[in-house]
């Protein structure tokens, strides 16, 4: 009863302070007006601005995914969602942002971060391949590479390290460059 409620509230308080990955970047203005140049992300942001709402999948697999892969400090991700969504409330946003979406709590709620490349977005939407794919792929594979020991030791993610190791050096150079350019333009250190 009340003991469980208090324990869960304390867990939420701790979860809100978590930053498993140690991310420190901040969002630039483009994350508020939908001018990042990544079509799926910009559409999701503009929808949030217009409606104050979006389905769970765009929230999780587009917006949070990209914020996490851009190394945005989770407290700024949480702040963004609290500002942008009409249904924003701690009981929703703390577990969604710090737990499920970013894995900032280190696995209190989930066994892995929800990260994906452009392939998932293409499969789950009507978007066509474009320049945005290389940027998202660069952010994704950069995240995997930076966290290679975590990915290697997680049974649900270890196959990604093998995919990365087989990727051509030319492809890596191209997409990592696109990722770094995006980070430089659309995040603040």
What spans do the regions from the language model cover?
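Short acidic alpha-helical/loop segments enriched in Asp/Glu that coordinate divalent cations
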Residues: 10-18, 60, 74-83, 93-95
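Alpha-helical support elements that line or immediately flank enzyme active sites
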Residues: 63-67
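Beta-rich accessory regions
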Residues: 163-189
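C-terminal, helix-dominated tail/subdomain
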Residues: 21, 26, 82-171
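C-terminal substrate/ligand-recognition segments
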Residues: 55, 68-69
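Active-site-adjacent "gating/activation" loops or surface patches in catalytic cores
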Residues: 11-50, 54
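Secretory-pathway/luminal and periplasmic proteins that interact with or process carbohydrate-rich
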Residues: 7, 71-72, 89-92
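Short, small-residue-biased leader/transition segments that mark boundaries at the very start
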Residues: 1-6
């Amino acid at each position: 009863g009340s003991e469980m409620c208090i324990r869960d509230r304390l867990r939420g308080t701790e979860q809100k302070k978590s930053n498993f990955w140690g991310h420190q970047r901040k969002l630039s203005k483009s994350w508020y007006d939908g001018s990042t140049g990544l079509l799926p992300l910009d559409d999701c942001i503009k929808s949030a601005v217009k409606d104050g709402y979006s389905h769970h999948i765009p929230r999780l697999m587009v917006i949070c995914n990209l914020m996490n892969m851009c190394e945005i400090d989770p407290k700024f991700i949480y702040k963004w969602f609290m500002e942008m969504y009409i249904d924003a409330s701690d009981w929703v946003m703390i577990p969604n942002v710090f737990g499920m979406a970013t894995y900032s709590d280190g696995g209190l709620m989930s066994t892995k971060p929800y990260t994906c490349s452009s392939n998932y977005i293409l499969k789950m939407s009507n978007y066509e391949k474009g320049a945005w794919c290389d940027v998202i792929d660069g952010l994704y594979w950069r995240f995997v590479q930076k966290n290679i020991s975590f990915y290697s030791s997680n049974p649900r993610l270890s196959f990604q390290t093998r995919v990365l190791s087989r990727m051509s050096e030319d492809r890596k150079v191209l997409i990592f460059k696109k990722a770094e350019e995006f980070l430089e333009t659309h995040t603040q250190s």
